[in-house]
Swiss-Prot record:
Record-listed ATP binding positions: 12-19, 38, 127
InterPro entries: MnmA-like, MnmA-like_C, MnmA-like_central, MnmA-like_central_sf, Rossmann-like_a/b/a_fold
Family note: Belongs to the MnmA/TRMU family.
Catalytic residues in the record: 103, 200
Reactions listed under catalytic activity: S-sulfanyl-L-cysteinyl-[protein] + uridine(34) in tRNA + AH2 + ATP = 2-thiouridine(34) in tRNA + L-cysteinyl-[protein] + A + AMP + diphosphate + H(+)
Residue(s) at site: Interaction with tRNA: 128, 344
Main location: cytoplasm
Record bears the keyword Disulfide bond: yes
A Pfam family this chain is assigned to: tRNA_Me_trans
Function: Catalyzes the 2-thiolation of uridine at the wobble position (U34) of tRNA, leading to the formation of s(2)U34.
Record's protein name: tRNA-specific 2-thiouridylase MnmA
Length: 379
């Protein structure tokens, strides 16, 4: 048996079952384990309850149970500067950002990693459902989690090789049910705690009300691309491509099909809507992406075929990547895809391996007759 006692691992403990079992497994494997709770947001909820206090109490219970030291570190400034300001700026520009991708890149695997190094850590560990495999050259490859329903590689796609080299995902190969079983068998206080949902560190508060506290809403016209007015919207930032709820439009026209958001015009403050789930305006053939990063230093070439996800839990789609610079690309789909959303992450896969990703700037159709782009989303 390998002696890990001289290898220090600092575990990011959230007060949830996944990070609790992560710390438990590492302790059982003989590592020198330290638990650290990150406070990244002043998260007093709508009822005046500070959930961070409750979560830290759970961390304390778990750490005491398994016999490891634990600390709390405050990254509220780092989160605000590196994640939240980006989040607001994207919404201000009519896009729908994915703060979880940025939070992992800038806070959990950057600010936290830096802090762990100050504690003389050899590695950090997180309770993510993803796997790391190193090849014969020592290059770290990120693979999908063993539980396909919990796989989190989509949110980890912006991590660098350096970040991955210093990271461990001890539960990455496991099923969620197995994680809960281990927690129960060990008598951990978090064994039956429900999973957190909502935006990274903002939680489950009323999103529209929350966003309105930071950005002034600008109501405007809601209309079809043919110019037919359908009412007013509350502010473009509250809507995303493909959204059905909250439009306040009944059936009408030649059918009673529901209405969906099909585009935004930021300059004129117009929200475009279309009728029918399969409305052709919701489908795109390709997209342009920026901020492209790759996890491994492998040269994929300027044109290559793989699969991609455009949102979490989506089925993989066959695509061809055409690199237009080191950090930008045009992504062409094997078949049209519905409701591509600017601001979200496009994440690339080769089988089980997550290759990296980028940010969706715009999606469009290319007309077959003159190859003109029909830009659908106007942002």
């Amino acid at each position: 048996m390998v002696d890990h006692s001289n290898t220090r691992v600092v575990v990011g403990m959230s007060g949830g079952v996944d990070s609790s079992v992560t710390a438990l497994l590492l302790k059982q494997q003989g590592y020198d384990v330290i638990g650290v709770f990150m406070k990244n947001w002043d998260d007093t909820d709508e009822n005046g309850v500070c959930t961070a206090t409750e979560d830290y109490e759970d961390v304390a219970k778990v750490a005491s149970k398994i016999g490891i030291p634990y600390y709390s570190v405050n990254f509220e400034k780092e989160y605000w500067d590196r994640v939240f300001e980006y989040f607001l700026d994207e919404y201000k520009h009519g896009r729908t950002p994915n703060p979880d991708v940025m939070c992992n890149k800038e806070v959990k695997f950057k600010a936290f990693l830096d802090y762990a190094m100050e504690l003389d850590a050899d590695f950090i560990a997180m309770g993510h459902y993803a796997q790391i495999e190193r090849d014969e050259n020592g290059i770290a490859h990120m693979l999908r989690g063993g539980d396909s329903n919990k796989d989190q590689t989509y949110f980890l796609s912006a991590l660098s090789q350096d970040q991955l080299q210093k990271s461990m995902f001890p539960i990455g190969h496991m099923q969620k049910s197995e994680v809960r079983r281990l927690a129960e068998e060990a008598g951990l206080a978090t064994a039956k705690k429900k999973d957190s949902t909502g935006i990274c560190f903002i939680g489950e508060r009323n999103f529209k009300q929350f966003l309105g506290e930071y950005l002034p809403a600008q109501p405007g016209k809601m209309m079809t691309v043919d110019g037919l007015e359908k009412g007013t919207h509350d502010g473009l930032m509250y809507y995303t491509i493909g959204q059905r709820s909250g439009l306040g439009i009944g059936g009408g026209g030649e059918s009673n099909d529901p209405w969906f958001v099909v585009g935004k015009d930021l300059e004129q403050n117009i929200l475009y809507v279309g009728q029918g789930y399969h409305n052709e305006l919701l489908y795109a053939d390709q997209l342009d992406a920026s901020k492209m990063t790759w996890i491994t230093p492998v040269d994929h070439g300027t044109d290559f075929h793989c699969t991609a996800k455009f949102r979490y839990r989506q089925q993989d789609v066959g695509i061809t990547v055409h690199m237009t610079s080191e950090t930008t690309a045009t992504v062409v789909f094997d078949a049209p895809v519905r409701a591509i959303t600017p601001g979200q992450a496009v994440v690339f896969y080769d089988g089980a391996e997550c290759l990296g990703g980028g940010t969706i700037d715009v999606a469009y159709k290319v007309a077959t007759d003159d190859a003109d782009k029909q830009v659908l989303q106007y942002v």
